[in-house]
């Protein structure tokens, strides 16, 4: 089963705030038709555990599209082997450091009219296994219309396999391991802790 949210909104949509996004995630998790939670956890669900929204984690980034895109198999937590391309790169400054995140496109979703402009940013950082899920987190993205974009880590969320073992989740590539703490977005679920996989490239 697929393991990430498909709540994708335009980066430039200032009306859809970080708070609104988090409220939408809570609604998704509370709804039995869209929630990844097991029945027992769904019955007791009140809210996901978020870091306090912090504007320091809303950064301006420069998007560079990769013209020569090569397909590859992105490793997952199961034997599922989804095909992706590295669609582009985001360069930004956070906590005084110049950082980069690679942005990927699912080849399956790229032919779906509803999600053809959907991009995917799986990443790890120094909070994993401590305050956040050990397997990393995800950000949703859309193909931008311009090179200057906004990257909002307050919208970082856990893969569904952090909540339910029936899901198959992409493992963030090592090239998307950020050498900083991203104390924004969704925290780890309950006392769930999984060590980062540093062997995936």
Role assignments for model-derived ranges:
Residues 12-15, 157-201:
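Extended, aromatic/histidine-rich regions of cofactor-dependent oxidoreductases associated
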Residues 63, 103-107, 125-127, 153-157, ...:
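A mature extracytoplasmic/lumenal domain signature
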Residues 55-57, 69-75, 144, 175, ...:
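Terminal leader/tail segments of proteins
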Residues 120-157:
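Acidic, glycine-rich flexible loop segments
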Residues 70-134:
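Mid-length scaffold segments of soluble, non-membrane domains
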Residues 1-15:
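Bacterial Sec-dependent N-terminal signal peptides
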Residues 12-69:
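Start-of-domain marker
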Residues 40-45, 50, 70-86, 102-103, ...:
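Extracellular/lumen-exposed scaffold segments
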């Amino acid at each position: 089963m697929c393991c990430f949210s498909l709540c994708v909104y335009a980066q430039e949509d200032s009306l859809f705030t970080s708070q609104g996004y988090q409220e939408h995630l809570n609604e998704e998790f509370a709804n039995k038709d869209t929630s990844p939670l097991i029945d027992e956890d769904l019955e007791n669900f009140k809210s996901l555990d978020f870091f306090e929204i912090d504007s320091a984690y809303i950064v301006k980034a420069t998007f560079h599209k990769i013209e020569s895109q090569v397909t590859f198999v992105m490793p997952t937590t199961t034997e599922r082997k989804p095909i992706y391309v590295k669609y582009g790169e985001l360069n930004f400054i956070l906590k005084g450091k110049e950082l980069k995140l690679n942005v990927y496109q699912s080849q399956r979703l790229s032919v779906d009219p509803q999600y053809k402009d959907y991009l995917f940013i799986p990443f790890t950082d120094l909070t994993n296994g401590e305050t956040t899920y050990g397997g990393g987190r995800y950000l949703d993205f859309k193909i931008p219309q311009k090179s200057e974009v906004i990257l909002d880590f307050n919208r970082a969320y856990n893969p569904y396999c952090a909540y339910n073992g029936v899901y198959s989740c992409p493992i963030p590539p090592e090239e998307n391991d950020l050498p900083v703490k991203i104390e924004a977005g969704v925290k780890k679920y309950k006392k769930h802790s999984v060590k980062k996989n540093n062997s995936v490239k």
